[in-house]
Amino acid sequence: MLYWLIDLSSSFPAFNVFRYITFRTGGAMVTGALFVFMFGPWIIDNLRLRQGKGQPIRTDGPQSHLMTKKGTPTMGGLMILSGLTVGTLLWANPLNPYVWIVLAVTLGFGFVGFYDDYMKVTKQTHAGISGRTRLLIEFTIAGAACFALVWLGRAPLSSSLVIPFFKEVMLNLGWAFVVFGAFVVVGAGNAVNLTDGLDGLAIVPVMIAAASFGLISYLAGNAVFAEYLQINYVAGTGELAVLCGALLGAGLGFLWFNAPPASIFMGDTGSLALGGMLGSIAVAVKHEIVLAVIGGLFVLEAVSVIVQVASFKLTGKRVFKMAPIHHHFEQKGWTEPQIVIRFWIIAVMLALAGLSTLKLR
């Protein structure tokens, strides 16, 4: 909404500052953080009161979790999504369609995760929405968003898969790109969901990825920078940096309460939404493959589950002591802080590797 203050810049030149995406990104970040810091304790108290026993803890998981995490409320994603939404609505350009598409995916996935969390908490079981139903809803949301992105963008770029490290190399998938894009968005959402298993483990890599894609969005949406770096220019996507800023701020606020020992868990409400947001931004700015690099930690977690399930069904043997892979390291004797901080370090290194694709061509 503050974007409209630009109209008053002829009378008040200071309002020209609202033209700059960088300024509004910083404003969205501060707004998201302040919102979560201010309302976080109230949200946590209400969730704890309404949930009673909190998130059910897996009895087949690490036994230490039964002692240290029992009774902790979930659905903390509500804090993040609230701060993210307020920051975005306050600072982003309301006429930019990319903002609304990505925000719709984020909140849509958040609703799916919220209902899943609600089912688990009320029934005190790990069985929330059935897998098929959940995937059907996710693919419907993601498919609609990707259709809009292809229709909105410039052909043939909008329907093409861009290959990093090479100049102007891309595969035009036509309308089949909608299906591919939907897989990227749904895959990202569920990969982040699988990563969210330890205090602070998911939110920091999500923020690292958001910062990276905030930069990529800004550069891809700026014709001068895009030409200099020889990346594909996607008009209008620079505004997505504001969403990334809002996520960074809300994520920092959430980490304050999610730092070990966590006062609240993100839950599917947050992990599905944030993963879906990263996936939809990657599709919008044509950096889907780069997402697999920057979000390599999420890919590793998801692949570990796929490998574990496939191996057990085919051979009756498990590759890992437990999946996702962060539980494997727990079973090997790593402490929770060791796993979390080491995974953060990996996330930083992967982000730097992904950002290197902007220049190495």
Swiss-Prot record:
The chain crosses the membrane at residues 25-45, 72-92, 95-115, 135-155, 169-189, 200-220, 240-260, 264-284, 289-309, 338-358. It comes from Rhodopseudomonas palustris (strain ATCC BAA-98 / CGA009). One of its GO terms (molecular function) is metal ion binding. Its EC number is 2.7.8.13. This is Phospho-N-acetylmuramoyl-pentapeptide-transferase. One of its GO terms (cellular component) is plasma membrane. The lineage of its organism: Bacteria, Pseudomonadati, Pseudomonadota, Alphaproteobacteria, Hyphomicrobiales. Catalyzes the initial step of the lipid cycle reactions in the biosynthesis of the cell wall peptidoglycan: transfers peptidoglycan precursor phospho-MurNAc-pentapeptide from UDP-MurNAc-pentapeptide onto the lipid carrier undecaprenyl phosphate, yielding undecaprenyl-pyrophosphoryl-MurNAc-pentapeptide, known as lipid I. It catalyses: UDP-N-acetyl-alpha-D-muramoyl-L-alanyl-gamma-D-glutamyl-meso-2,6-diaminopimeloyl-D-alanyl-D-alanine + di-trans,octa-cis-undecaprenyl phosphate = di-trans,octa-cis-undecaprenyl diphospho-N-acetyl-alpha-D-muramoyl-L-alanyl-D-glutamyl-meso-2,6-diaminopimeloyl-D-alanyl-D-alanine + UMP. Pfam families: Glycos_transf_4, MraY_sig1.
